[in-house]
Curated annotation (Swiss-Prot):
<dbReference type="InterPro" id="IPR018265">
    <property type="entry name" value="Ribosomal_bL35_CS"/>
</dbReference>
<dbReference type="GO" id="GO:0022625">
    <property type="term" value="C:cytosolic large ribosomal subunit"/>
</dbReference>
<protein>
    <recommendedName>
        <fullName>Large ribosomal subunit protein bL35</fullName>
    </recommendedName>
</protein>
<comment type="similarity">
    <text>Belongs to the bacterial ribosomal protein bL35 family.</text>
</comment>
<dbReference type="InterPro" id="IPR037229">
    <property type="entry name" value="Ribosomal_bL35_sf"/>
</dbReference>
<dbReference type="InterPro" id="IPR001706">
    <property type="entry name" value="Ribosomal_bL35"/>
</dbReference>
<dbReference type="GO" id="GO:0006412">
    <property type="term" value="P:translation"/>
</dbReference>
<keyword id="KW-0689">Ribosomal protein</keyword>
<dbReference type="GO" id="GO:0003735">
    <property type="term" value="F:structural constituent of ribosome"/>
</dbReference>
<keyword id="KW-0687">Ribonucleoprotein</keyword>
<dbReference type="Pfam" id="PF01632">
    <property type="entry name" value="Ribosomal_L35p"/>
</dbReference>
<dbReference type="InterPro" id="IPR021137">
    <property type="entry name" value="Ribosomal_bL35-like"/>
</dbReference>
Length: 66
């Protein structure tokens, strides 16, 4: 069996927790922040756990956990 390649773009975007959950950064935080509400900017800080429907897709991109 040959080695599986890690998708490098996904490895830079996702992190695994010790319990096996996958975290991601938030979108819409790079620029044009003036028109966005303070609530939206505050809630998009930090990392968030991905939705369970996306787990299989991300795990295929990161066969060795990133």
């Amino acid at each position: 069996m040959y080695k599986l390649k890690t998708n490098r773009a996904a490895a830079k975007r996702f992190k695994f927790t010790k319990s096996g959950k996958i975290k991601r950064g938030c979108a819409f935080r790079r620029h044009i922040l003036e028109k966005k509400s303070p609530k939206m900017k505050h809630q998009s800080r930090g990392m968030h756990v991905i939705h369970e429907t996306d787990y299989n897709r991300v795990e295929k991109l990161l066969p060795y956990g990133g």
